[in-house]
Structure formats: structure tokens, C-alpha cells
């Protein structure tokens, strides 16, 4: 061989010195590195060079130097050992493990009870047993996540976020795989759907489609939204939350750890804040964050429910005589069709807050649209505490609200034209009756009605069997 190389003057790969060969092998993927073992004795020896496997351990398994130091194993044996355990998830493991690691690191000092509620990872045989029970294969990225943490204990607050209004509360727990399997759906409208989350207060769940059926794409994550205009219980529309489990989980975690979702009273609140949605008037700054509530919304009839959280803050550098009190609010509300509604009233949510240097006042309210999106803007009127006759307006920045992408139930798409027209007429009659009733109510009456609805809703939730029936949506009063 050497004689042939000397005669031809060619330089083969194996004739290269060790260092250049190791450099080349450092760019080779783990599969090709393993295959090098079968090419020649020399490549087989070089492919076991331990530093080559350090990169793969960090890339695929996120094993740190500190973790390695705590084990009496080389990088290569660590890679092989981990691969033998979770190798089937190698395309998902790094993204899922990073999301879990980042989430726990962020929540430990802020929501320690939530982190303590997480369960240990499930075993492969546990996941296999669930697949046998439901008769469907679980997505690999779902299985991968549950190998790390098998959901959480059904406690409040839930890991997947909360939302609170004066007469409504939601907190979603991440279900363990056995509880989820008990809620696996075989009925029409949600066939082959597995619940991911559950709220013990509202019965709300997010589902993942483990098979493509009834117009859903495989692995899609969604909120169910029963069609309230159809007589067919299988008519269930969907608000799409994620294309896959990985997309759904990692995007949620990114919103949490980036500070996009605020932590309020040891809970994650699913408000989205646009950094540009801030307005400053003099020493007062107003910022807004919003959230869509699927459990209080419907596609048929079109009723999209949003809540918004407003923060009013006076600069610490403001002079003491700039202290002021909010007198009234003015809103200009525009839907996607360009229809405008103007609302003016005293105070905010029944209060007349005093703002002084360094003080922050926050409140939550809600609104609804008959279109999938809309926006609000307006101003507050204040008077100075030391100069009560002097009033001024503070701008509220324009903030946009839009519901997630939704998909209409195939049961509605298969509906005949006569049946559809009849449903539309019934819905219009119901809407007219609701409008007539609401026109006779003043603000205090609305508040009383809200409290009664809340009490009734709690009783209804206690009576409802978990995962048994679609959520019956109740309309909260529109607040400004």
C-alpha cells in the first residue's frame, strides 16, 4: 500500500496524520462517527477518541461539564448509555430538555410550589401501556417530554397558566399520562384526541390530535370550541394553539422565561404584552397586555372574548404636587369591520385610584368582539390632588386583540344549506333577545348578574364529569 502511494504520489485519508484526521472527525455526525468504526482499524480507533463524543453529548443530551464530572464515565460511554435509554427521541430531546430546564430554573425562585408539583418522568413501559390502552401511538416529542416529567399533581396554580376575572378563574394543570389516557376521546367531534391540560374550575382542556381525523392534522394542539348553533354535538370548532407538541410546549416556555407572561401572586398569567403598546403623558405611563379566553368564546355564533390588563405608573422622579386621582375613562373600540363604539364612564372597575410618584396601579377588564380581531384606544381624565380644579387627560395606547387561528368543524361543513339557514335565523333571534335584555340593565345590575353567573358556573363545574362533555360556554358581561 505504501509502495503504491509512493509511486502515485496520492495521499489517502488513512495516511493523514492523527491530528488532521481527528479534526475531520470532529465535524462528523454521531451516526457517521459510529460507521467509521467499520471502515478500517485506524478509523475505528480514532472514532473512539473521547473528546469527539463530548460535542455529541452536549448537542443531543445537553450533558454539562458539571454533570460529567459527577459520573465516573467517559463522554463516549455517557453518549451510549443515554442513547440506549432515550435514543428514539434524539431528534426532540435537546429542545424538550432545554425547555424543561429553562422553565424550572425560572420558576424555582418565583413559583416554588409549582415546581414541587412536577412528577418524576414516566418509564418507557408506562408510555407503551398507555398506547395499548388508547389504541394509538403517542407522538415521539410527547413521549420525550413525559420521560422527563410525567405532568404535575392536580393542584392550583397550574403549570400551563392562569387567568382571573371578577367572576371567572382558570388555571391549567399539565396532566400526567395516566390521567390523560382516562380522558382520551373516541366520541365524534373529538375522535383520537388526548387531553394535555385540565382546569378543575372550568373543565377546560387543551387537546393533542394523536391521529388525523375530522379535519384535524396529526399532532395539532387545540382548544375545543363547541358549535353553539348546531344541533349535532359532534360539531366542535377548534382554536389551534400549536402545530406539534414541541411547538406548543417550547413557545409557551419561551413566553414564560422571557417575562412575556407575568408572574402574579405565584401564578403564571397568560397576558401578552407588546413592547410598543406603551404611552407616556407627562409623568404618567400607561401600558397594556391582553389575552384571549377560548373558554368564553365561540366561532358559531361569532363571539370572541378578550381580557386586558392595564398598568398605570407615575415616575419616581415626579414632583409630589403631581399626585393625582383618576376621574373617568374614555374608550374608542373598533372591530375588524371598522365599526366604532365609544364608551365613557366614571373611574375604572368601580375605583378612582390615586397616583403619586413611584406608585403603580393595575387593573383587569374585558371586552368582546363579533369579529376575530379589533383594537381599543382612549384616555383617562385625572385631576391634581393639590389643584382639584385642574384636570388633564392621559393617553391609553392603541392595543390590538386577535383570536388564534381556528378550524371549523367538519360537521358544520357537511351541514345542508336549509339546516344552516335555520340555525342562522335561530341565532339571530337569540342575539336580539339578549340585546333587548341587556339594554334594560345598568352597571350595578350587570355586576349582580355576573356574581350570580359565577356561583351557578361553580356549581355546574362541580357537577360536570371530567372530560365527559363539551364545555358549555357562558357569556360574561362586557366591561370597559
Swiss-Prot record:
Ranges for region Disordered: 419-463
UniProt-recorded Gene Ontology molecular function terms: ubiquitin-like ligase-substrate adaptor activity
A Pfam entry, by short name: DUF525
Main location class: nucleus
BP GO terms, sorted: protein ubiquitination; response to lipopolysaccharide; SCF-dependent proteasomal ubiquitin-dependent protein catabolic process
Keyword RNA-binding among record annotations: no
CDD domains with a match to the protein in the record: F-box_FBXO3 (cd22084)
Pathway(s) where this gene product acts: Protein modification; protein ubiquitination
Biased composition (Acidic residues): 419-458
Record flagged with keyword Nucleus: yes
Bridged cysteine pairs (disulfide): none
Domain ApaG: start-end pairs: 278-408
UniProt GO cellular component terms: cytosol; nucleoplasm; SCF ubiquitin ligase complex
Highest taxon above the source species: Eukaryota
Subcellular location: Nucleus
Keyword set, alphabetical order: Nucleus, Ubl conjugation pathway
Protein task: Substrate recognition component of the SCF (SKP1-CUL1-F-box protein)-type E3 ubiquitin ligase complex, SCF(FBXO3), which mediates the ubiquitination and subsequent proteasomal degradation of target proteins. Mediates the ubiquitination of HIPK2 and probably that of EP300, leading to rapid degradation by the proteasome. In the presence of PML, HIPK2 ubiquitination still occurs, but degradation is prevented. PML, HIPK2 and FBXO3 may act synergically to activate p53/TP53-dependent transactivation.
Subunit: Part of a SCF (SKP1-cullin-F-box) protein ligase complex SCF(FBXO3) consisting of FBXO3, SKP1, CUL1 and RBX1. Interacts with PML, interaction is direct and takes place either alone or within the SCF complex.
Name this polypeptide is given: F-box only protein 3
Gene: Fbxo3
